[in-house]
Amino acid sequence: MTVAITQTGPALQEFIKRHQRLFVLSGAGCSTDSGIPDYRDLHGGWKRPQPVTFQAFMGELSTRQRYWARSLVGWPRFGLARPNATHHALAALEARGQLELLLTQNVDRLHQAAGSQAVIDLHGRLDVVRCMGCEQRMPRTEFQLLLERDNPGWADLEAAQAPDGDADLDSVAFDNFVVPACPACGCVLKPDVVFFGENVPRERVERAFAHLQAADAVLVVGSSLMVYSGFRFVQAAARAGLPIAALNFGRTRADDLLSLKVEQSCAQALAFLQQPPDPLHTATARYHSARSA
């Protein structure tokens, strides 16, 4: 497939206007304007060391100490992040009646905060902590109080924000950091997100694929698609013959599958969605949505 590359928005606008049931796959590039760093450079490589793996987190106390210490320092800023223009634009796309599903690889819940409702959090949500024994869950804000109680002084440390709601603590020893256990059963507590090396819950994947089957096109926003859990949906769309557009700076894993690629700020390229829609186009979108319901 020949990839059409443009530096401006008109081609993307036309792509979106042509389709009434868009399957949108979003990534870290959606949230950078909210102050949350992304993971990859323009070539798709890591900007920093790879995130912790599920196996290391579950198997090594030292890994959990390092993870939760960095999270204790970084969470307050992450938790205060607010939706930006990209999140609001995608919420507007849903309000226009053109969204089949917003499948996000992000764990920040900013799409929901902007008003999006048809959302699946592919990799979970960082604002919840889950016990790996009894499955009890608690808000991340509540767990923050436990971390600060057991580790006085750590909350006063200053460090640069990192992508996973944590902070870059490079010259700190974690040996004496206390990791609270589950108050109910004493087992390991983990953020309710999918770590590297951990499987996305099957039910979540199946729901997303069901929506993909009902879609008439795919739009990738702010993702290089280097992680297979997201890339496989684009692969499936290509096999089904769906047109695929990507809005992302730099290389994506799906470049040879795209019918359109736009390298432009997500907020700028999608700004038109927050303008009053053409009445005829809106009526047409609602008609198609009603017929396929």
Swiss-Prot record:
Q: Which gene is this protein's source?
A: cobB
> A GO molecular function for this record?
histone deacetylase activity, NAD-dependent
User: What main location does UniProt list?
Assistant: cytoplasm
Q: Which domain of life is it from?
A: Bacteria
Supply the NCBIfam families for this chain.
Answer: PRK05333.1 (NF003738)
Lineage runs: Bacteria, Pseudomonadati, Pseudomonadota, Gammaproteobacteria, Lysobacterales
Annotated protein name in UniProt: NAD-dependent protein deacetylase
Binding-site positions, NAD(+): 27-47, 105-108, 222-224, 248-250, 266
Q: Which PROSITE patterns match?
A: SIRTUIN (PS50305)
List the subcellular locations: Cytoplasm
| Co-factor requirement | Zn(2+)
What keyword terms does UniProt attach to this protein? Cytoplasm, Metal-binding, NAD, Transferase, Zinc
